């Protein structure tokens, strides 16, 4: 500031309305690729912790893919806090993009975080083994492993019809 510049502070997990706008634009890539490959995602599932990613995905999907549900798997064992943060960042991102956030579109699924943040449970370890063995996909026990464990549980529960196209986003961490 002393030099006449406008510094940009980047919070943990890029958790801000502006950070959410970045993931709103990620929906454009998913939209383009799904059309090129001739499928329409029923849902996009990912692990939700710092909340801006999910907020951005929801705002972006509302604009480009309104038929697609965004499902966040809580990885912090704090689903109420995560949902509140998604709503907060989502309203801010939506305002930046000239739209609104429907709070009914915010879904944070609890029960897959294990005992606490950074502490995996058996379903997470199993999901990591499945992904590595069947797809050569490297997952970590803090984020993506918990997210995939949640997705597997939702599939086994019959959440979606068997012919549904579900996109799992691996945001890193491994």
PLM features: residue spans?
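Short glycine-rich anion-binding loops that position phosphate/pyrophosphate groups of nucleotides
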Residues: 13-15, 50-51, 113, 144, ...
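Glycine-rich phosphate/pyrophosphate-binding loop at beta-loop-alpha junctions
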Residues: 20-107, 169-174
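A polyampholytic, Gly/Pro-enriched intrinsically disordered region
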Residues: 1-3, 91-97, 131, 161
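Short beta-strands and strand-loop turn motifs
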Residues: 7-13, 72-73, 108-111
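Active-site-adjacent helical/loop segments in soluble small-molecule enzymes
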Residues: 103-163
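C-terminal capping/lid region of NAD(P)-dependent oxidoreductase domains
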Residues: 162-170
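Short, small-residue-enriched loops and turns at beta-alpha junctions
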Residues: 15-20, 79-80, 114-118
């Amino acid at each position: 500031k002393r030099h006449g510049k406008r510094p940009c502070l980047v919070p943990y997990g890029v958790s801000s309305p502006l950070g959410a706008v970045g993931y709103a634009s990620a929906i454009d890539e998913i939209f383009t690729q799904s059309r090129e490959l001739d499928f329409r995602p029923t849902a996009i599932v990912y692990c939700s912790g710092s909340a801006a990613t999910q907020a951005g995905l929801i705002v972006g999907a509302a604009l480009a893919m309104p038929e697609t549900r965004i499902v966040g798997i809580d990885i912090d064992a704090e689903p109420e806090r995560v949902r509140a943060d998604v709503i907060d960042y989502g309203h801010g991102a939506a305002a930046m993009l000239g739209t609104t956030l429907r709070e009914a579109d915010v879904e944070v699924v609890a029960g897959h975080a294990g005992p606490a943040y950074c502490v995996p449970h058996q379903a997470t370890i199993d999901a990591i083994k499945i992904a590595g063995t069947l797809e050569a996909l490297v997952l970590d026990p803090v984020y993506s492993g918990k997210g995939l464990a949640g997705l597997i549980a939702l599939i086994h529960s019959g959440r979606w019809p068997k012919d549904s196209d579900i996109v799992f986003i691996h945001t890193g961490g491994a």
